């Protein structure tokens, strides 16, 4: 067997190994595709959290085309959990309260947050459309009742029903949990996607729905 032929085989083996490497090694890098939070979100194992605000244009865009498909692709590993950011927008507090109530209503009814019947989804997209498409500002913070009415009407809920549900312990617990959203949002703004409460995805480096889902799957099993 000639030395030249042996060398040719060796090169072929090395090339084959190099080509196989991307399929066996991680395609994602800490510091480039994601970061580890110094202060993890508590009680968030096996979740994909999205920190968002009704007043965030990119949150609206992601919710129209990205969030649902990604959540669906990773549903076998993580549960999607929205965290509304109370500190953004003139009516962040009112939005958080109705979102927490509608999430509880959807859960009790066994309705997915992505379902067209979801009260959470109806209120969210009513505010998104009013704020970003119609440029509605509800008197710039001076008319919380009008802002709330937009969400309530979309969700098909009365003011009395909302006020009663807001007092429920589960709703108050959700609002308390959402306070952790502020520290996460300070890092790169919103939307902010967090896997298992500790891995923050760098949204600027998301290439596609499939690659984002792949990253979530990898982080969920770390």
Curated annotation (Swiss-Prot):
Tell me a GO cellular component.
Answer: periplasmic space
Which subcellular locations apply to this protein?
Answer: Periplasm
Q: Which residues form the signal peptide?
A: 1-27
Q: What are the protein's UniProt keywords?
A: Disulfide bond, Periplasm, Redox-active center, Signal
Q: Which CDD domains match?
A: DsbA_DsbA
Q: Which part of the chain is the Thioredoxin domain?
A: 28-221
Question: In this UniProt entry, which cysteines form S-S bonds?
Answer: 56-59
Q: Where are the transmembrane segments?
A: none
InterPro entries per UniProt: DSBA-like_thioredoxin_dom, DsbA/DsbL, DsbL, Thiol_disulfide_DsbA, Thioredoxin-like_sf, Thioredoxin_domain
Q: Which GO terms describe its molecular function?
A: protein-disulfide reductase activity
Pfam family of this protein, just one? DSBA
Q: What does this protein do?
A: Involved in disulfide-bond formation. Acts by transferring its disulfide bond to other proteins. Part of a redox system composed of DsbI and DsbL that mediates formation of an essential disulfide bond in AssT.
Report the family membership: Belongs to the thioredoxin family. DsbL subfamily.
Name the chain's protein.
Thiol:disulfide interchange protein DsbL
Q: State the organism of origin.
A: Lelliottia amnigena (Enterobacter amnigenus)
Q: Which gene encodes it?
A: dsbL
């Amino acid at each position: 067997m000639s030395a030249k032929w042996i060398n040719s085989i060796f090169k072929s083996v090395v090339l084959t190994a190099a080509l196989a490497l991307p399929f066996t090694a991680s395609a994602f890098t800490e510091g480039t595709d994601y970061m580890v939070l110094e202060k993890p979100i508590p009680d968030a194992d096996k979740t994909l959290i999205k920190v968002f605000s009704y007043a965030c244009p990119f949150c609206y865009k992601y919710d129209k085309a990205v969030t649902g498909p990604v959540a669906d692709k990773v549903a076998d590993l993580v549960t999607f959990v929205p965290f509304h950011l109370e500190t953004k927008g003139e009516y962040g507090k009112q939005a958080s309260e109705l979102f927490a109530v509608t999430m509880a209503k959807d859960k009790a009814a066994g309705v997915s947050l992505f379902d067209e019947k979801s009260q959470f989804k109806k209120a969210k997209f009513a505010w998104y459309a009013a704020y970003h498409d119609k440029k509605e500002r509800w008197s710039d913070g001076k008319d919380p009742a009008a802002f709330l009415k937009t969400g309530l009407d979309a969700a098909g809920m009365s003011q009395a029903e909302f006020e009663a549900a807001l007092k429920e312990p589960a709703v108050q617990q959700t609002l308390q949990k959402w306070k952790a959203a502020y520290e996460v949002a300070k890092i790169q703004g919103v939307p902010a996607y967090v896997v298992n409460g500790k891995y923050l995805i760098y949204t600027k480096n998301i290439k596609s729905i499939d690659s984002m889902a792949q990253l979530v799957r990898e982080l969920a099993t770390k």
